[in-house]
Amino acid sequence: MSRPDSAVSLLPDYSLRAHNTFGFDARARVAARIGSPGQFASLARDPRVAGLDRLVLGGGSNVVFTRDFDGLVLLDEIRGRALVREDDGAWYVEAGGGENWHAFVEWTLAEGMPGLENLALIPGTVGAAPIQNIGAYGLEMKEHFASLRAVDLATGELVEFDAARCAFGYRDSFFKRDGRGRFAIVAVTFRLPKAWTPRIGYADVARELAARGIDARAARARDVFDAVVAIRRAKLPDPLALGNAGSFFKNPVIDAQAFAALRAREPDIVSYPQPDGRVKLAAGWLIDRCGWKGRALGAAAVHERQALVLVNLGGASGADVLALAHAIRRDVLGRFGVELEMEPVCL
């Protein structure tokens, strides 16, 4: 699951431009490439970096740098993926924290272990997936999560986390709250049930399957994977061509009474009933209705095809993107009385 431990080389005054999908040219006071859990642990006791704040970076797809990072950036490059066990009901697969998420999903399908196909093409690494509890098209990562191992960056101890300890929420977990900045996730194990049925509740997925001449009831996991990839490529910009961090805002969830009042004013509002009686709203619809889709503030803009995505047109800073985000939040709150929450971590 990783290369053997070796001495960790430190990289002073390190550019993070290639390590965040917005392409911001922030710099780290010092950085280190990490290829094993032992290397994470060794830096907990390394006098060269004693007292420095620490930041673990995988793909950098969920971070907005508003300034240089005056500390130690740990670049997670722990690789490896394997079937670690199976029983009558499921396969258990493990992947290193530095593995590319999309490549991992594609590998599980190639190995005949479906279940994660709705999460195809989400940017980032396997280690970042539990932090955000990534989700898309009717599936959240937590539904197939078994356990993870993480290094305590203060002590160097290797710690095991089950789902309860991770405290997953909507695009949220222990690692975004009490555990923020304290742990480096080095490996994640997923449980993929052998009794598989397609998740095709989202209209976009059903439409894409139909356009491909596929009966949704007979869809294979690879069909769903291909449909999701096509949808995401049509709607979302490639970060290599146009800097972005994917969905910038969470879809807000409000109580039924507030929704009834809102729908009386906005009868065509896009919404999704939740099991607990609350209602999830489509943040992109709210932003679009406020007239922000396709608009720019300087070199930061709202994408023309997906209002949830903020983009760097070239030369924007993290502060520029945050200024745009705050303007959008202000307008949505003023018109709908709904407060949008940002998904990325802002530093």
Curated annotation (Swiss-Prot):
InterPro entries, A to Z: FAD-bd_PCMH, FAD-bd_PCMH-like_sf, FAD-bd_PCMH_sub1, FAD-bd_PCMH_sub2, MurB, MurB_C, MurB_C_sf, Oxid_FAD_bind_N
Superkingdom, taxonomy of origin: Bacteria
Required co-factors: FAD
GO biological process, one term: regulation of cell shape
Homology family: Belongs to the MurB family.
Function noted in UniProt: Cell wall formation.
Protein name per UniProt: UDP-N-acetylenolpyruvoylglucosamine reductase
Organism: Burkholderia mallei (strain ATCC 23344)
